Amino acid sequence: GTYEQPNSAYLADFIREVNIINGVATPQGDGYDIAWAESQPPLHAQTTRGFSDGQSCHLAIRPEKISISTEEPETRNKVRGTVHDIAYLGNLSTYHVRVPGERIIKAQTANTRRLSRRALTWEDDVWLSWTDTAAVMLEE
């Protein structure tokens, strides 16, 4: 129910450390393109909710739905940023990434011992990415 599909930005704020990205929706294909920062390509979200062209919206994305990598991913929902802070909790790492517009987006990953690549650290340039269905579109 509510946990997977929160229906208001107010509610989403209280559900874990959800990322909220503010933007403007434009109908596109199977969902909406969301303009969210100057000179950045739009993000895309699939939803069954109806939004009008040019309507303000919020994208809510849980940190564990966001992938973080040093190489540019092959997906349309990708944002370049810099690691600002890292929080370790048990077997989870939460990366606080500064993205265009001086915003912070949190990405959470499970720590695995078989990480052959160098661990991410502060000030690293990274890419955040997620699937078209990972973000929930909310009205203002």
Language-model regions, residue ranges each:
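N-terminal sensory regulatory modules of PAS/LOV and PAS-like folds
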Residues: 11, 25
